[in-house]
């Protein structure tokens, strides 16, 4: 965290911090002038004990509670409907507590399902805008064969956060890359985000 602060970052996302207690993470971030703006939190814990998840985020001073990936059992035409049903209660609890459930996608959400829609369409249809936001990942939108700028425009009111990640190629292989070292049009992407003005946090990610 000290190194991030020295680079000049002022906001961070927490993900996979292991057994470090929320209070300890808050103290570490506070000591380095970093504000926690988003987490990726175990979705199973959200289902079993959403009250504790909300309480932990109160300690962290973090409003946005993120699902890093849809659990595999939901990644079917029937499963995605179960996902929206199962997570509706924690999403409402988070909203009522002044938080927002955030969903981070990959590329499989663009897979066409039986209804002719894709999985992302179902999420947007079933969850009202005040119940779920989308953490858009520039790499994974491109990997899905979708247009990054069109997707940003479509999801603008849900995009509290955007993961900035580039895509490079080696032969026929797609590779994650540092922003600016791949082929995504980040000048165009950033100008669009600035013009729309709905995204609060741009989070640089390097898997």
Regions from the PLM with identified roles:
Residues 1-64:
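N-terminal pre-domain/capping segments
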Residues 1-2, 22-26, 50-54, 84-91, ...:
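Generic structural signal for well-ordered alpha-helices
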Residues 4, 12, 29, 57, ...:
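Conserved, mostly hydrophobic/aromatic
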Residues 7, 34, 60, 130, ...:
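Structured loop/turn residues at beta-strand edges in well-structured enzyme cores
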Residues 12-14, 36-41, 65-67, 101-103, ...:
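Hydrophobic faces of well-ordered beta-strands that scaffold small-molecule active sites
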Residues 43-133, 141-143:
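Active-site acidic/histidine proton-transfer and metal-coordination neighborhood
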Residues 96-186, 192:
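Acidic/histidine-rich catalytic cores of soluble enzymes
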Residues 182-207:
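Long hydrophobic alpha-helical segments typical of transmembrane helices together
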């Amino acid at each position: 965290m000290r190194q991030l602060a020295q680079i000049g970052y002022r906001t961070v996302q927490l993900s996979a911090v292991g057994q470090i207690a929320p209070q300890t993470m808050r103290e570490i971030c506070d000591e380095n002038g970093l504000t926690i703006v988003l987490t990726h939190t175990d979705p199973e814990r959200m289902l079993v004990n959403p009250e504790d998840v909300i309480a932990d985020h109160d300690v962290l001073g973090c409003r946005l509670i993120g699902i890093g990936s849809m659990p595999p059992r939901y990644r079917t035409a029937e499963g995605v409907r179960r996902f929206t049903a199962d997570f509706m209660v924690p999403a409402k609890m988070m909203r009522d507590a002044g938080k927002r459930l955030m969903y981070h996608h990959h590329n499989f959400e663009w897979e066409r399902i039986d209804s002719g829609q894709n999985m992302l369409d179902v999420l947007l249809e079933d969850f009202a805008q005040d119940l779920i936001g989308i953490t858009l990942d520039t790499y994974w939108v491109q990997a899905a064969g979708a247009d990054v700028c069109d997707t940003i425009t479509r999801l603008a009111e849900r995009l509290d956060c955007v993961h900035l990640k580039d895509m490079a190629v080696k032969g026929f292989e797609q590779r994650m890359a540092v922003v600016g070292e791949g082929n995504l049009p980040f000048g165009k992407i950033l100008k669009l985000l600035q013009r729309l003005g709905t995204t609060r946090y741009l989070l640089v990610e390097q898997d």
